[in-house]
Each structure stands twice: as structure tokens, then as C-alpha cells.
């Protein structure tokens, strides 16, 4: 196992992980699966909130060491408990940073600065450190002081508005957005590591979770910018691909999911269901007609 880890892409990279819950920790977890060593830094006064999430253990409080959510999101780590409100705790944290390559944190903007562990403070300890800050809407701009978790920045980023059924309220997507933010952070850290390898320079990465959602709704944004159209929720239907939905079948709670993207697929589908003549029917001749 040791030999396998030593040959991993990020072998020799150490990450000081100050982050909590999902978007921050999972970014470090993804990098740990590539071989990086991750040290999770917590405080008993402000431990990772995901430790209290039960899910598969039932509705009861699972205890700080038994949360399946924490076990998944913050897997594959070393850990240390520090009181960052005391000078001794901050100094120990800086000693960890001094021997690390990356810092990951997802506190609200300004928190790490007040603790004495902001980017400007840590580059004095480790000049080439890669410092990733992840927050709801980033550390700059008119909304920088907005705090929030996935249900909030899923709405701010626009994904919630177009997700769900037309006759129902928007669906916030919750944990899926956290994972997307974590993937964005992990990718940014990999790019920063490559940059440092070539130039010797570290950098401060400011990730806005709301902006990271843009990759999901690029077509929606372009439609609004170019055509002034605001798309709405449409369930599992698609504007062009048809048929494209979940359809009820005979029997109790029986469904079939059909997604036809091309005319060739439509021809194959009509043959498969025993109605090849539908391919010749002008009402269904192309996706726009269907």
C-alpha cells in the first residue's frame, strides 16, 4: 500500500485543511485520493458540523465520531485539535502550514484573517503556500459578506430556479452544489500546484460557490444574455430532445425513462417498441415536431 501511495500523482503534497462540512473538506478529500496527505485542523469549540449529521444512523444524534456524512466527506486524513482563539493554537497551526503545500478553508470571508491565519499572515510563514478560500459568493464584490450553505448559493447561482417541475417550487439541489464547488476547488488547487512547480510561486485562490454553478447552466445564461429569455423549470423534459421524460407504465409505481437525442435513436426506438411506422409519420419526423 505504501509503495502504491508513493507513486500517486500528489505523493509528497501536504494539505492543511481548516475547512468544515462539505464544500471545503471534500475538495481536500479528492486530492487525498490522488496521494496528498491531508491534516484536518478542528477545535472542540467549533468542530466540523458534519460530525453531527446522522443520516444512515437514524434521526438520533450519532456522536462526534460516528457520523457517516463526516466519514465520507472528511475521509483519508490525519487530524489535530487546536484552539485557534488562543495564541498557542494559532502558532501550532502556523507550524503545520510551514511544512504544508496547500491550505484549504471555507469560513466566511474575514474569519481566518481575524484569527491571524489569513493569506497575508501565512505567506510570511510559507511564501509559496497555495491558499484556497471557498465561500458562498467569494471574498470580493458587492455580496462578499453574504453567508450561506448550498441551498442559498444554489439559488444565488441560478441553478435552483430552473431545477424542478413547472408547477412546483424551485429545487435547491443542496449537497450536489457543495460537491460541484469542491470539484472546482480541487481543480483550481491542481492548477496552482502546476503553476508553482513551473514558477515557484504560490497563490491565493478565491472560490465562489455560486459562480462555480455557472458550468451547469451555461446554455441558460447565454440564452438570457443573447435572447433576453428566462428559462423556467420543466422537470425531465428537454427543449429539443424528444421524447425525453419519465413516463408512467402499467402497474403500481412503475415508470420508464426515455431520452431520445437524435433521429437515428428515434428510428431505433420505434422499431424496439413495435411501431416503426412512427418514423415515417410527419408529426414525429424530427425532434422539433416530436
Where are these predicted regions, by residue range?
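Oxidoreductase and adenylate-handling cofactor-binding alpha/beta cores
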Residues: 182-203, 215-227, 270-277, 281
Amino acid at each position: 500500500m505504501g509503495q502504491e501511495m508513493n507513486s500517486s500523482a500528489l505523493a509528497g503534497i501536504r494539505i492543511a485543511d481548516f475547512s468544515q462540512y462539505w464544500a471545503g473538506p471534500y475538495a481536500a478529500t479528492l486530492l487525498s485520493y490522488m496521494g496528498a496527505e491531508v491534516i484536518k485542523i478542528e477545535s472542540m469549540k467549533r468542530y466540523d458540523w458534519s460530525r453531527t449529521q446522522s443520516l444512515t444512523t437514524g434521526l438520533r444524534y450519532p456522536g462526534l465520531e460516528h457520523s457517516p456524512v463526516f466519514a465520507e466527506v472528511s475521509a483519508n486524513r490525519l487530524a489535530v485539535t487546536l484552539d485557534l482563539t488562543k495564541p498557542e493554537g494559532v502558532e501550532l497551526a502556523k507550524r503545520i502550514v510551514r511544512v504544508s503545500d496547500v491550505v484549504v478553508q471555507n469560513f466566511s470571508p474575514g474569519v481566518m484573517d481575524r484569527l491571524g491565519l489569513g493569506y497575508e499572515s501565512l505567506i510570511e510563514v510559507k511564501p509559496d503556500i497555495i491558499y484556497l478560500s471557498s465561500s458562498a459568493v467569494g471574498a470580493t464584490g458587492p455580496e462578499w459578506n453574504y453567508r450561506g450553505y448550498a441551498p442559498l448559493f444554489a439559488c444565488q447561482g441560478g441553478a435552483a430556479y430552473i431545477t424542478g417541475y413547472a408547477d412546483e417550487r424551485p429545487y435547491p439541489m443542496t449537497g450536489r452544489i457543495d460537491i460541484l464547488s469542491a470539484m472546482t476547488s480541487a481543480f483550481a488547487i491542481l492548477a496552482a500546484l502546476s503553476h508553482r512547480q513551473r514558477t515557484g510561486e504560490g497563490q491565493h485562490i478565491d472560490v465562489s460557490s455560486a459562480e462555480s454553478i455557472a458550468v451547469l447552466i451555461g446554455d441558460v445564461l447565454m440564452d438570457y444574455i443573447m435572447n433576453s429569455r428566462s428559462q423556467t423549470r420543466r422537470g425531465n423534459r428537454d427543449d429539443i430532445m424528444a421524447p425525453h421524460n419519465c413516463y408512467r407504465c402499467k402497474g403500481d409505481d412503475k415508470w420508464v425513462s426515455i431520452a431520445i437525442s437524435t433521429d437515428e435513436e428515434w428510428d431505433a426506438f420505434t422499431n424496439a417498441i413495435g411501431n416503426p411506422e412512427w418514423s415515417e409519420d410527419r408529426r414525429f419526423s424530427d425532434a422539433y415536431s416530436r
